[in-house]
Every structure is written in C-alpha cells, then in structure tokens.
UniProtKB/Swiss-Prot annotation:
Interacts with ADRB1, ADGRB1, LPAR2/EDG4, GRIN2B, PTEN, and PTPRB. Interacts with unidentified tyrosine phosphorylated proteins. Interacts with FZD4, FZD7, TGFA and VANGL2. Interacts with DLL1. Interacts with PRRG4 (via cytoplasmic domain). It comes from the Eukaryota. Residues 18-108, 413-495, 581-657, 729-811, 852-939, 1022-1104 form the PDZ domain. Residues 193-204 have a biased composition (Pro residues). Residues 116-290 form the Guanylate kinase-like domain. SMART domains: GuKc, PDZ, WW. The keyword Methyltransferase does not apply. Residues 184-266, 551-575, 664-691, 818-844, 939-966, 1109-1151, 1168-1476 are annotated as: Disordered. The modification Phosphoserine is found at residues 236, 598, 702, 833, 916, 1321. This is Membrane-associated guanylate kinase, WW and PDZ domain-containing protein 3. Belongs to the MAGUK family. One of its GO terms (molecular function) is ATP binding.
Length: 1476
C-alpha cells in the first residue's frame, strides 16, 4: 500500500561469515577481540595471528573469507554478542568447540564500533535494525540495570528492576558519558548505563542466558525495556545515507530489499522480537517517508505507527480510531475514476495468485475483489449509478416501515426448497431496527435462481407467515437455520427498494453477524473462494442455514453486482460492543495476561502467555470474574480477585469487546485481527478513514491465504455430506509426545475412522478443537474412508516425521446443542487455524406469539410440568426456560395450553427471563394453587416427538429418585414441578394392584418407542460431563445384545452427572460423543465413553424416572452392567420409593403409602429376569457359590414383606432395599459402603484384576453369571444374569470361571474376614437347604441364579428378595457357628434339593456378632428377633404367616460347589444359622 522508497544497499548485504579454528595453547584464541559494551562499543576484531610467534596461537580460516581487523563481530556460532562486555564475548567464544563460525560486518555509517550511536538511531519497528537494538539491550541488561528518575511502583525492586535515582544524579551520569542511551518517557528520565568491565561476584554467569535465550523467561526483561524503548531519546537521529549503505525500503511488509543473504541471516534476530512498540507522538519516523515529497507534519493528535509486519498505519487520537490512509496524502490521492490505465488508487494492491488469478486488495476498507477498481469506478461513472444510489438512499431511509401495507413496491411471493447449499441467495441489512433486510445476490443454480421469482434488492417481508420487518439480521438468519434440508419456506418480498450503495454514511454498520460457513467462523483475514457468484458482505445461507460471508467473487456480471462491494473483511462483526465469555485456566505463573486501568474498567493490557487465556485479546474490558461483577473494583482489588484462584482453576471471564477502542499503537498480531470489530468506511469523503482496530492485514493476511486453506474452507459449502454434520480442519504441530490423540476404528472396509481419547496436555488438547468421536475424513489431504487402521497409522507416522498434520474431521451437530460461549470468539491458536464458532441455535420467540396459560391445582397435586433452564447464557432475545415435560392427567396436561418445548417468559406477570433457576421455583411455590404462565409457542416442531411422549405417563410412574426431586436443590438445569410444589403424593400414589398392573404394559410399550431412533435429535438435549475424581458418576443399562436402548441406570451422589443436574435416571442415551447409540452394544457404549478421555458428550432424551427392565424387552437377555464411573455414597437409610420432597407432603399414614409402593414394586419386578438379587445400594455382595440351579415361576410373584414402620426400622438397622431408579435413595450397610467408596472404579478390567473388579460392582449378585449350567435344570444355557459390572466384558467371561478361581476367591474372602470385616452366615433349613446372607465386603464370587416364587400381595418395593422361611422353617432350632467351624462344607446330599433364600444384612447386628466370639449364646435371641421382625412385616403387608406358602422346591442337580468360608454349615443337624 505504501510507496517504495529509494532503495539502497543495507548493511546486512555486507555481512560475511567464516569458520575459524585456533592452533596454539588452550584458551588462546589466535585473534584479538576488542571493544565491548563497557567501552560503549560493539565487539570487533583486532589483529588476527595467522603466523606463529610470540608464543601465541594462530588463527586458521577453515571456510569463508577471512575477516578484516576492525570488522564488527555480530554473532558467534549463531549467538548474538552485540551488547556484551569484552569479557563475556570471550567467554562465549571459548564455550564452543573449534572451528567456530563468526559473523562480521564491515563498519559503516549505521553500524560501526560506536554502540551509543547505533542505539540512538530510529528504525522501523519490525526491521532488522530494530530487532538488533532489542538484542543489544537484552545483552546489556545481563550486566547493567537501567536507571530512572521516577518513583518505584508496586512490586518493583530497586537494584533489580531499576536503579531509582534523582534527576541530579541522572544529569551527572549523562554528562559523564556513563549512559549508553537516555531519554524521557511519561515525564521521567530513563537511561541505560554502561556495564562494568568485570561483573560483581554476586552476578550469575550470563553465558548460558546468552546461549540459550529461548529457554529463559525474558518477560521481566521486556517489562524493564519497555519504557527505555518507548522513551523520547534526547540524541535520536536518522541513519545517515552513504554510497554503499542505504536506508531501509518500506514495501508494505517491513522487509528490506536485500540480496539473497538477507533471508539467510535475518532469522537470528527473530527470537527476540519485542512485544511492545514505539508510542511517543513526537517520533514521526520521517526517515521512512519519501524525502522528495516534502510532506508536512502530521495533523494535530495524529500519529504514525507500524504493525508487527512493518505496515504503516495512522492513529487519530481525536476520534480514537486508526486508518491505513496517510492524512497528509489524502488531498493528493486520486479518485479511482481519475487514475490512468495500469495505475491503482492509493491504498490498493494487486495480487497475482497462481491458483486464483489476479485480484485486488483495498487496504483502506479491508476488502478484496476481482475487478480492477479503476475499471469498476469508470464503469460506474459512465452508468451514473453512484449518483442514483446516493439519491435513493435517503428515500429508502425515510420510508422504512414495519407495516407491510405501507411498503412501496410490488409484493412477490416465493416458495423455496432448502437444498444442501441453502436457499441460494444472500441477504444484507438488518443492522439497525430501522433497516430493511434485502436480498443482496441470487446465487447461480441455487433454489432461488431456479425459482426465478427473487431478485437482488427485494426486501424480505414475511417468512412462513411471520413478519420480519424490523427484525435483526441474526433473527432472520436463525429463522432460515431452523428450516431442515429439503423443506420448503414461504417468502413474501417487496420489490422496489434499491440496495444501499458504498457512498452511504461511513459510520453505518455493515453486517452485524459473525459470518459462519458450515458452523466455522470466517474471520478477518480469511478468504473463501468459490466458483459461484459470491459477493462481498453478503450472508450465504449454507445447508444448515448458517450465514457465511464470502470475501471474494470470481466475476462481476453487471452494474448492480459490481456496486455491491461495500461489506468488507473488517465488517465481519458489529462495531457495537459485545459481551464475550472467555474461559481462563490459571497456570503456574498466573492467567497469562496483564491488566491496566481504563475509563471503562480494567482493560487487558498485554497477553503474556496465551495458552492460559485463549480467546482473550488486548483491549478487552473485564466485566465479571467467575460471575462476580468487578466493574466497580479498583485495579488492586481485581488483581486480588484473580490471585485468590488456585493453580489449575477454570475461571470464566466476562469481557466487553468492540466499540470505540482506546488509542493504541499496539501492532496487533494476526490473532488480534480475528476479533469481531466493525469497519467504518468512506469513499468520497476527503478525510482519513477511521477504523476501530489497528490494521494488520498485509499480503499474507489478506485474501492471499495458502491456496489449500482457501479451498478447504470453501469446499464444504457444496460438498455432499450427511445433514446435521459439519467438517472442520485442524492443524496440529507435533510435540514430543506426539499429536496428542488416539485413533479408533478401521477394523473393516465399511467402518469409519474416529478420533479416540484426547491425551491430556497433548497437542490436540492444547489446540482445543479436536473432539473424541469426531469422524476422521482426511489426513494431510488424503481421504481415509475405507482405509484400515494400520493404513491410517502409517499416514499419521508420515505426518509425525514432517512435524505437523492437517486433519479434516466431521462432527455431528444437532438441535439445541449447547456450545461454550468462549469458543464463539476464540482467537487463533498457535497452530494458525481458527477454532469453531459453535454458536447455539436457539428458537426465536416472537413477542406476538406469547399467550397466557392459567393452571389451577388441587391441594393434593402438583401443577404437572417440568421446566428446563439453559445453563449457558442464551443470546439476546432468547428465553432460556422451556417446558421439558408435561405429566399426564395433571393440571398442565388438562389445560391443553402447554406442550413440551414451549418457552416460559413470565410467571404471574413477572418476567423470568433473567431469573435464576431457584428464583423461578420459589416464584411458582409462592403462587399457591393457581399460577399464570406466559408461554411462547415452540417453533422447532409442532407437538412433542415420540421420544418426548414417553414422559407423558401416569403420576404413579413419575416419581424421581431422592436427591433429585427437590427443585430448589437441583444443581443443574431441570426442575421438576410435577409433584414437588405443594403436592400431596398420597392420592397420586394410591392405586390398587389391578390398576398398577394395567399400567405396566403400556409403560413398556412407550419405552419401546423410546428405544427406536425416531427423529433422535428432536426433543433431546446434550450434556457434556467432565470426569471427576472417581468417574462421570452414572451407570447405564441396555444395549443391542439385550434388544433394548441405552438408559441411565443410576446417578452417583456428588458425581459429575448429578452435579450437572440435567441427567436423570431413566433418560435414554441417544448419542455418545456424537455416535448414535441405535444398534450399538453395551460394550461399544462403554468404549465410546472411555474413548472420550476426561470428557463425554451425551445426547439424552428425557425419560420417566423409571428404568425399562430388560425383562420387559427380552426376558432371556441380561441388560445392565455398571458403567458407573463414580460410585455414589449412600443417602440416609430411611429412604423410600417416593422422593424425600414428596414424602414431606404425605398426610396419610405410612402404611397406605407403603402398601401402594409394595404393589408398584412388585409389578415393576414382575416380568424381569429371573436372576434378580438383593441389592445393597448398588453394591451387591456376591454369594459364594459355583453352580446352583434356580428356577423362577413367572406366574407366582415372590413373597415379600410390608413397609410400614417395621420396614423403616429395618432401614435404620442397615437393611438395604432396592429401588428401581437406582438413585441415591437406597439405604445401605454403612461399613461396607464406606469400604466400597474408597475403591476407585476402573473403566476396563485387566484380566489379572478381574476378581478385584468384580468386588467393586455395586450389584454383583446381578452381574455374575452362573459358573456351571446343568442340563435339565430348566434354565436357558445361553442366558446371562443381569449385571452392572464396571467391566464391559465381564458378563461374557464369568460363566467360564474355574473351580480354582473360585477357591482363590474364597480364600481371599476368608482372609478379608480375618481382618475384621463383617461375616457372612448361612441359614440352613432342616431339609438341608441353606439361607445365605452376605456382607457387602465380600464381593469376590459370582452369585448363582435363584428360584423365586412370586405372590403379588407379598412383593416389597424396597427389598429385592427377602424370602422368609415358613413356620416350619422359622420354628426350627438353630445355632450360630463359631469362627472355627467356618471351613466346613456341606455334602452333596445336603445341597441337592436346596433353595437358597436371601435375607438382608443388618450392619449393626453384624458388628455385634463380630465382636461376640461366642455365638451359641446369642443364636436364639437373633433368631427370635428376626422372626419377630418378619412377622410384623408380614402383618404390615396385609398377609399372615398362614398365607405364606412353603417355598416351592425345585430339583437341584448336585454339583461340586463350595460354600464360602463366611457361611457356616453345621453338619447334618438341619438347623439354619441366621445372618444378623
């Protein structure tokens, strides 16, 4: 953009290198090194001894031309020595082995021996000389400390940061010549003294710092040199011209026109590029302007500055704006139409690209085009379009209206079908409330072009019956986004309004939406080329309806098209201020940025380490830190707030970005150019063009990107790919540990390749864009579809040799995906490719669609709906609260005015849009029995999808697990108002057995619909969890092998899942890390979760709170295995089937409620797999048997006990009950629970650790298969027990356990018992049958199946199986076997007809038994106590002992099974030892 100065040779062209070696005594260099910083000189060469003499060594030139005496020494083996003392220079030379490389230059008028002279010269920032000056200062500060006359600031240490001296002392130093450079900055004197010839004994050896500068933290040096480099030098001067040495030529990039040696030698200065600029306004840098132009000084309060790449820009401190245009040349600049052929207007650049041909860059307005701007201007002038548009603009503005009847023009109606490329037209406008949205361009071959009814300039009036006059640009784009591919949209347009012209008001905002192409943000400096007629500034609606700004077109077909060039690169964002949330991570040295005071608050002054504050930009104003408003805090208070966070803490930062920026000379890096800032344009005005950001786009940052990058960014617009997916390119640089991710898949020709685990602290995690379960499409441009796993690894190995890789991955997206706000404004990473702008796609709620719904409930019921609240802050105008479920038969259902997905904007006339979750709950509670909701109808779909219908069930099935029901204690998004707000659950839960029996079958049918993948993305919500110390905190049930879907089985208390608050027991898992779960196995689901590393992304469909049992799907298949990565600690032992919240409102007796619960539970368990075992709060003890054949009569429900006060008593005594929802509402054995909680649950089982893994399963009795299957037993040999094992493969392997393994486990169980764990005991019936109870501690052996006889009236909802003995059994005398008898085993005859029954364990009684060594004296008491409890429970359940038939005896084939050592068998007496 700038004119080239008169080019002369730079001193760099005279630099020469040679390799020399010494011959002589060790330490004798054979050459004389003179000068040094202590003398104010560069190091330079003296006499070279090329002949032996005087006892010294000789200098032998190995290669290159021998240097001459007096040559300035710049480098030794690539290490800069300028600014070092003579002593340190010699130390550096002696450090290297011979031969050594010397880089020297002949002294001239710029570089000579005088160090002070060189430091006093003014050089363009980013130039070689400027960098060399910084190298000199850094080397000086190894031995000297700058001095200043200002007072010390907070944290500064005198003698370390500065020597703080008086003005008189400073003057004395200056007059004595002791200062190498001096000047003033901010009214204070600064100077750099000469270093001492000999360092003090306390100073470290600087050689290592000089040699390995990149390994040392130079930030402190940078802070110290900032003021020195910014100061106004008292002796500053311009480099003198000489015949063989010339000034630098500015060509727009800050590089010098030199010989070939330039590129070879300039890299050595790159490592110390400073992070600050010249800012003093008196430094006009006149030496870089053409002398013959005789330009006058800059206008008042104007300043010229340079980008990091050397481009000149100008700062107008009057308006706090920046511009590329030199205000002094504005008057001399020609209008484009006045330029000659071959001449370009000022500020334009012509780019010759080998792939895309010739195009033009307007550096003033930050835009590109293919047409020559001179030819374009002349054509416009001939047609007179500029005047026409200018005249019509005022008319257009004056006639804006929101009333369609007042529009002037012809109404046009069109119906367009959305294709994979969108609707085929671009829109512009809508940046202000009084601006029309108009069609800017109709794309060739698109749906709009094929329809033929839409033309450029048409005003969009109506979309699908919704008037959009006055709507914002973003509003309309979102409406188009919500239209699925292949669906039609009806448009009403008005023809008769011209498009706005370039010559409009220069301060108008151009496009107020971040351009997005296929979900990826297209920011300033990026280019998207296409073969279509894309026009600048237009919003292209792609297949997802996202808007993408195309920054170049390949041809311009007419006057109207060519005039549509006003939207520019810089207009990718609004000039209006915007609030952005940035996630910070506190590193070992802080958050990686510095702040300073500003009129609007604490401003980000400098980015010190971007890895901890990715997305943060210089100039951002801090508004909130971790949701705490800090706008009114002082600088020190904000610093203290930041200091209080520990290392590693994630701290969200709310910042204000955009708007009028404060004056700055900071040459923004490429990262800074990615911020969303507006561009203010002018064409015809003769005043300088203001821009709210410092321009930094040169040839490399303008549309001339790498051709492959341009192609990859643009090809996705029309690429044939599945809907609801997006492709992105991720460029990674290899670290020592590799690229930081694993690859899955490729096992077959049709299997895709997926990204596996993201390695912590690896390259992929630091980059932040790659996700587990992303489908890998290409590696360095090579498609991997159909390739084997090994071939993919070979490609990655090749990429690793190159040190970098470009990955193309495909990611599935879905409605309502909650994306972190921080990524919507992520800056470029160090790899140079942008992060995704994964903006949320909310449904817009038009105010005219709102209506009121009044709900009135009875005293004994709730309102019957569930509210979902978005955790992340929604976009402006989007209501974050919506209906998540409507309970069947509830007031919400009866009124007919609420449906799933409707948004709630107000409660009783009070707006809740900005209210917190808890406040909304309280507001509804305070409403009493009547509440009025202001509802905004859902726009995404009409009526709930089939998956959501599963939520509409009887209130009897709607109870939530304890710990999740009380709305004001839920830690997440969802509050359940179905029964929690003033609800009396008694009437809701009073159902007869027959009523409940009829409910079970429809329940199963509805859940079957949930299992099918019907429109999965609708009605679902995404949840992303981070692994906690003990896992994700949930467990699954189901899978393809069980002929059912995947469901949430339980939530661990205090685990990540329950803390998130959106996950509930019974929710169906639709996707795991982007992969659909339809048809996948249980094992595959676990692998997907494990592949995600520390994070997992789940797509969930709301459930009913009940878990569909595998018996309801396939009674011959097991279905549950533990994927509970975080075992939950127990709640209070007095838990009940209904939630705590609901029980607090039960006015009826507990007996009535408990009887209903018993009936419910019995029916729920009726059709389940036969092998249900007793559960101890999800940690089922294993019954130590190898092979026992159990049969179950599905006709006869099992017996059970009631749940009145006696049931609660049993809970208090540690008797564990099993709840269907497997949530934290089960009582537990305290001792065993504490034991389990201390053991982390592994994700995969090592074969060597299988026994230990089993011990960790919360329901081992259910998870273990039979060890031996006997023919003729009535059991299906292929049938597996239901289990919830932490190992995905455990179910298939348990059946093969050998006897030796069992013995080992038994011995281990025995050793654990010796350590003091509660003991197991066996209750042996008179006929040889045993009744076994197991401590939760002993989890080492699989439990066999069981014969169960059911009776409906005796099924308990709390106890899985408590098979009580008959009168005959209970009256039999028995005794408790002592410890010494534990090793005894039963005979085959004793066990041949045995039916093992369970009784629950009382932790208190177990502990008492463990303490009492003599069990014989207590046997009768224990037996009597249990019998009494049993009888009372039976009475409570409404049955008598006479009604309890004897257990049906199934023939058992004798087998070589062993009784665990914990179980005491007493010979042949037939007496049962009860476990107490």
């Amino acid at each position: 953009m700038s004119k080239t100065l008169k080019k002369k040779k730079h001193w760099l062209s005279k630099v020469q290198e040679c390799a020399v070696s010494w011959a002589g005594p060790p330490g004798d260099l054979g050459a004389e090194i003179r000068g040094g910083a202590e003398r104010g000189e560069f190091p330079y060469l003296g006499r070279l001894r090329d002949e032996a003499g005087g006892g010294g060594g000789t200098c032998c030139v190995v290669s290159g031309k021998a240097p001459s005496p007096g040559d300035v020494l710049l480098e030794v083996n690539g290490t800069p020595v300028s600014g070092l003392t003579n002593r340190d220079t010699l130390a550096v030379i002696r450090h290297f082995r011979e031969p050594i490389r010397l880089k020297t230059v002949k002294p001239g008028k710029v570089i000579n021996k005088d160090l002070r002279h060189y430091l006093s010269l003014q050089f363009q920032k980013g130039s070689i000389d400027h960098k060399l000056q910084q190298v000199i200062r850094d080397n000086l500060y190894l031995r000297t400390i700058p001095c200043t006359t200002r007072a010390p600031r907070d944290g500064e240490v005198p003698g370390v940061d500065y020597n703080f001296i008086s003005v008189e002392q400073f003057k004395a130093l200056e007059e004595s010549g002791a200062l190498l450079e001096s000047g003033t900055y901010d009214g204070n004197f600064y100077g750099t003294p000469k270093p001492p010839a000999e360092p003090s004994p306390f100073q470290p050896d600087p050689v290592d710092q000089v040699l390995f500068d990149n390994e040392f933290d130079t930030e402190s040096q940078r802070k110290r040199t900032t003021s020195v480099s910014k100061m106004e030098r008292m002796d500053s001067s311009l480099p003198e011209e000489e015949e063989d040495e010339d000034k630098e030529a500015v060509n727009g990039s800050g590089s010098m026109e030199t010989r070939e040696m330039h590129s070879e030698t300039s890299d050595c200065w790159m490592k110390t590029v400073p992070s600050y600029n010249q800012t003093n306004s008196s430094m006009d840098f006149r030496n870089y302007m053409m002398r013959d132009e005789n330009l006058e000084p800059l206008p008042k309060n104007w300043e010229m500055a340079y980008t990091d790449t050397g481009m000149i820009y100008f700062i107008d401190h009057n308006t706090k704006t920046t511009t590329w245009l030199d205000p002094r040349l504005c008057k001399k600049a020609k209008a484009p139409e006045d330029c000659e052929d071959g001449e370009l207007p000022y500020g334009w650049e012509k780019i010759e690209d080998p792939q895309y041909g010739t195009y033009y860059v307007d550096h003033l307005n930050q835009k590109t085009q293919f047409e020559n701007p001179v030819e374009e201007a002349k054509r416009k002038k001939q047609l007179g379009q500029a005047e026409i548009h200018s005249a019509k603009t005022d008319v257009e503005r004056a006639h804006f209206t929101r009333d369609p009847s007042q529009l002037k023009g012809v109404l046009v109606r069109a119906s367009l079908k959305k294709s994979t490329m969108g609707f085929g037209f671009t829109i512009i406008g809508g940046d202000r409330p009084d601006e029309f949205l108009q069609v800017k361009n109709v794309l060739k071959d698109g749906p709009a072009a094929q329809d033929g009814k839409i033309a450029p300039g048409d005003v969009i009036v109506d979309i699908n019956g919704n008037c959009v006059l006055g709507h914002t640009h973003a509003d309309v784009v979102q409406m188009f986004q919500l239209v699925p591919v292949n669906q039609y949209v009806n448009l009403t347009l008005c023809r008769g309004y011209p498009l706005p012209d370039d010559s409009e008001d220069p301060v108008v905002d151009i496009v107020a939406a971040t351009p997005v192409i296929n979900g990826q943000s297209l920011t300033k400096g990026e280019t998207c080329m296409n073969t279509q007629d894309f026009k600048l500034g237009a919003m292209v609606l792609d297949q997802n309806g996202k808007s993408g700004q195309i920054l170049a077109s390949d041809r311009l077909n007419g006057p109207s098209e060519s005039s549509e060039q006003r939207a520019s690169l810089a207009s990718s964002g609004s000039s209006q201020p915007e609030l952005v949330t940035i996630p910070l991570i506190k590193g070992p040295k802080g958050f990686g940025f510095a702040i300073a005071d500003s009129p609007t608050g604490q401003k980000v002054k400098m980015i010190l380490d971007s890895q901890w504050c990715q997305g943060l930009q210089k100039g951002d104003i801090i508004k909130e830190i971790y949701h705490q408003n800090v706008q009114n805090l002082t600088h020190l208070q904000v610093v203290e707030v930041l200091k209080q966070f520990p290392v590693g803490a994630d701290v969200p930062l709310l910042i204000l970005r955009g708007g009028p920026c404060s004056p700055t000379k900071t040459a923004k890096t490429k990262t800074d150019t990615k911020e969303n800032s507006g561009s203010l344009e002018t064409i015809n005005e003769p005043i300088p063009q203001p821009m709210p950001f410092p321009p930094s786009i040169i040839r490399s940052g303008s549309p001339k990107l790498d051709p492959s990058e341009v192609y990859l960014k643009s090809k996705t617009l029309y690429e044939d790919k599945p809907p609801n997916t997006k492709d992105l390119d991720v460029f990674l640089r290899k670290q020592e540990s590799g690229f930081g991710f694993r690859v899955l898949g490729g096992d077959g020709p049709d299997q895709s390749i997926y990204i596996g685990a993201i390695i912590p602290l690896g390259a992929a995690e630091k980059d932040g864009r790659l996700r587990a379960a992303d489908e890998l499409m290409c590696i360095d441009g090579i498609p991997v579809k159909g390739k084997s796993h090994k071939q993919v690894l070979d490609l990655m190995t090749t990429a690793a040799r190159n040190g970098h890789v470009l990955l193309t991955v495909r990611r599935k997206i879905f409605y309502g995906e909650k994306q972190p706000e921080d990524e919507s404004h992520q800056a470029f990473s160090q790899n140079g490719s942008p992060r995704l702008n994964r903006a949320e796609l909310p449904t817009r709620s038009a105010p005219q669609e709102a209506y009121d719904v009044t709900l009135q409930r009875k005293e004994n019921e709730g309102f019957g709906f569930v509210i979902l609240t978005s955790k992340s802050k929604p976009p402006p105008g989007v209501i974050p609260h919506k209906i998540g479920r409507v309970i069947d038969g509830s007031p919400a259902d009866r009124c007919g005015g609420l449906k799933v997905g409707d948004h709630i904007s107000a409660v009783n006339g009070q707006s809740i849009v900005d209210l917190s979750h808890d406040n909304i709950v309280q507001l509804i509670k305070d409403a009493g029995v009547t509440v009025t909701l202001t509802v905004v109808a859902e726009e995404e779909h009409h009526g709930p999808p089939s998956g959501t219908n599963s939520a509409r069930q009887s209130p009897a099935l709607q109870h939530r697990p304890m710990g999740q029901a009380q709305a004001n204690h839920i830690p997440g998004d969802r509050i359940a108002l179905e029964g929690e707000i003033g609800r009396d659950v008694c009437s809701s839960y009073r159902h007869s057995w027959s009523d409940h029996k009829h409910l079970a079958q429809p329940d199963t049918a509805v859940i079957s619909v949930v299992g099918s993948r019907h429109n999965q993305s609708l009605g679902c919500y995404p949840v992303e969890l981070e692994r906690g110390p003990r896992g994700f905190g949930f467990s699954l049930r189901g899978g393809k092998e069980y002929n059912m879907g995947l469901f949430i089985l339980r939530l661990a208390e205090d685990g990540p899942a329950i803390k998130d608050g959106r996950i509930h027991v019974g929710d169906q898992i639709v996707e795991i890390n982007g992969e659909p779960t339809q048809g996948i196995t249980h094992t595959r689901a676990i692998e997907l979760i494990q592949a995600g590393g520390n994070k997992v992304l789940l797509l969930l469909r709301p459930g009913t709170g009940l878990i569909p049992d595998h018996g309801d799907w396939d009674t011959n298949s097991p279905s549950s295995s533990n994927v509970i990565y975080d075992e939950q600690p127990p709640p209070l032992p007095s838990s009940h089937s209904a939630s705590t919240f609901e029980e607090s409102h039960v006015p009826a007796t507990e007996d009535s409620l408990t009887r209903v619960q018993i009936c419910e539970k019995a029916e729920e368990l009726k059709d389940t797999v036969q092998e249900k075992k007793s559960t101890l709060n999800g940690s089922q003890p294993e019954m130590k048997y190898q092979s026992v054949h159990k049969t179950m009569s599905k006709k006869d429900p099992p017996r059970g006990s009631g749940h009145g006060e006696k049931s609660r008593l049993k809970g208090e005594n540690g008797v564990t009950r099993r709840g269907r929802s497997a949530s934290p509402k089960k009582s537990v054995n305290r001792h065993s629970e504490e034991h389990l909680e201390k053991i982390p649950r592994p994700l995969k089982s090592d074969p060597k650790e299988k026994s230990r893994d089993r011990s960790l399963s919360p329901r081992k009795g259910e998870s273990k298969g039979r060890l031996t299957i006997k023919a003729g037993s009535g059991q299906d040999p292929y049938r597996k027990d239901r289990g919830r094992s932490s190992s995905p493969k455990k179910q298939q392997k348990i059946g093969g356990n050998s006897l030796s393994n069992t013995e080992g486990k038994l011995s281990e169980a025995g050793s654990r018992r010796a350590a003091g764990h509660p003991r197991d005991s066996t209750e042996q019936l008179p006929d040889g049958r045993e009744k076994s109870g197991v401590s939760r501690k002993d989890l080492k052996q699989s439990q066999p199946g069981k014969t169960r006889t059911k009776s409906p009236e005796k099924k308990s909802s709390k106890v899985d199986e408590t098979s009580l003995p008959s009168k005959k059994t209970s009256s039999t005398a028995g005794r408790v076997v002592s410890e010494k008898e534990k090793g005894k085993k039963p005979t085959a005859g004793e066990t041949s007809r045995e039916t093992v029954e369970h009784t629950q364990i009382s932790a208190k009684q177990l502990k008492q038994e463990a303490q009492e060594k003599t069990a014989l004296g207590n046997a009768d008491d224990h037996k009597g106590r249990e019998s009494e409890v049993t009888d009372r429970c039976r009475e409570r359940a409404g049955c008598t002992p006479q009604s309890s038939s004897l257990v049906k005896k199934a023939p058992i084939t004798p087998g070589p099974w062993r009784v665990p050592r914990a179980n005491k068998v007493t010979g042949t007496t037939g007496m049962a030892d009860k476990q107490l």
